[in-house]
Structures are given as C-alpha cells and as structure tokens.
C-alpha cells in the first residue's frame, strides 16, 4: 500500500521449508520498512499547530489518508484506494488536488516519485496530441496506467489538467532550492524532468488559436470547461482555463 516497501523475494526449490522462510523474511522486511517510513514521515516535514483539537485531528487524519491513498508511483484513482468510483481510473486533473500539498508540507520526495510515471507515458501523450493535430504532449483526463486515454464523452475535451504537471514540478523544485538538504538535487532534477515542461508547454501553445483581427490568442470550441456543464461546441475561452 505504501509503495515504500522493498522486499527481496527468495526462491529455493531444494528446501521443503523455502516458502515459509521466504514469507517470514519478506514479512520482517515489510514490517521494518513500514515502521521506518511512518517514523520518518511523522518526524519530518511541516506541521500546523492550533489549539482547536478538531482542527488538529483533521490535519493529522488528512495527512495519513492522503499518504496511504495517493502517494504511489502512479497517480491515484479518483477516490484513492477507498472505493471504485469513476471506473477505478486515475484522473490527471485530480493528481494536483491529491498530492501537490506534499511539496508545501515538506515532503517533496513523495510527490516527485510519481513524476517518473509521466516520463514513462510521454510517448502516449505525444501520440494523443498528434491525433488531435497538435505538437507536444497532451495529457489525458481519465487515463490507464499505461497512458491510454480511457473511453469517455467528457475526458477527451477537458484541458484544465494540462499545466498541473508543470506546476507540481515547480513546487518540488522550489522545495529543493530552499532547503540545504535538497539543494544538491536541483541540477539532476531539472535535467531529468525538463522534457515534461517542454512537451507540455508546446501543446499548450499550439492549442491556442490566433485571431488576426483582435490580435489575441483564444481557446476555441470544442472544449469542455472545468464545470463539465456546458456544451463543448458552444464553449469558447472558458474563464478558469
């Protein structure tokens, strides 16, 4: 569940009790790693203290639930591990809501570990943009772990998730720049993830339509804005986007 457990699985067909020994070793390793993770998590980062006990209870509970449900190596499903709504798929406009807080609360490494997944599906995101006639990478809304766009009458026309990865990358970078313990990671970090910024921004630029008469760039139909309540063919320059 915690995606922090690294266990060495053992296989020994020559011993009758190999499976039992393997299970015991694996459980011991899992137990130790889980203990270490939670100890380090609650002993580091930032915290909010307030005399209101109910507020404190909610802060602590929220930090626990968000880490258990959302801090994996791939973005979480819409409702985490709790239930199976929205077909159990990851929704990239929700990744920001689920995990961006980790950078602000002193746990940037827990947010960063999901960025490799974006790199792994970058080819699919580029194919998605190309299918729509654009350059760069178009991140899907409802997505499989392989980066495939899941069937939906709404998801393909949503765009407000596009800048989220850039924003999250910047939030983690700010943490590294402002903390002497992390600062040595900055150059490696920028070199590794710049491709995500470049491809994401290229799509966002190409998506806009230039109007010669008004000398403006516009978001033209069809597009479904964040409210998901307006006809895509009648929507132009939605305010939030």
Regions flagged by a language model, labelled:
Residues 52-60, 75-76, 89-93, 105-112, ...:
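Conserved structured core elements
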Residues 77-89, 134-190, 205-241:
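The feature captures the catalytic groove of carbohydrate-active enzymes
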Residues 11-15, 114-116, 181-194, 209:
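Composition- and surface-driven signal marking solvent-exposed, interaction-prone regions
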Residues 1-88, 108, 118-124:
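Acidic/polar, glycine-enriched structural segments that form the non-catalytic walls/loops
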Residues 43-46, 65, 97-110, 164-182, ...:
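Well-ordered alpha-helical scaffold segments within catalytic/enzyme domains
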Residues 64-73, 110, 114-130, 196-212:
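Long, well-ordered core segments of solenoidal/helical folds
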Residues 8, 67, 103, 202, ...:
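Residue-level marker of positions within ordered structural domains that often coincide
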Residues 59, 92-137:
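Carboxylate/His-rich catalytic cores and anion/metal-binding grooves
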């Amino acid at each position: 569940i915690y995606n922090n457990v690294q266990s060495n699985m053992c296989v020994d067909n020559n011993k009758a009790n190999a499976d039992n020994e393997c299970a015991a070793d694996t459980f011991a390793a899992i137990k130790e790693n889980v203990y270490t993770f939670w100890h380090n998590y609650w002993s580091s980062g930032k915290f909010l203290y307030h005399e209101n006990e109910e507020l404190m209870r909610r802060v602590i509970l929220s930090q626990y639930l968000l880490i258990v449900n959302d801090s994996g190596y791939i973005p979480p499903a819409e409702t985490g591990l709790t239930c199976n709504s929205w077909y159990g798929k990851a929704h990239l406009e929700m990744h920001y809501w689920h995990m961006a807080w980790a950078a602000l609360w002193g746990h940037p490494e827990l947010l960063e570990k999901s960025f490799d997944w974006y790199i792994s599906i970058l080819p699919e995101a580029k194919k998605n943009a190309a299918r729509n006639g654009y350059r760069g990478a178009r991140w899907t809304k409802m997505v499989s772990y392989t980066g495939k766009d899941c069937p939906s009458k709404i998801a393909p026309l949503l765009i407000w998730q596009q800048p989220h990865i850039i924003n999250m990358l910047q939030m983690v970078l700010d943490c590294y720049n402002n903390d002497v313990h992390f600062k040595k990671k900055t150059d490696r970090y920028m070199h590794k993830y710049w491709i995500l910024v470049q491809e994401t921004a290229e799509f966002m630029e190409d998506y806009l339509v230039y109007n010669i008469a008004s000398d403006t760039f516009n978001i033209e139909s069809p597009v479904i804005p964040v409210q998901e309540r307006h006809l895509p063919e009648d929507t132009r320059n939605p305010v939030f986007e």
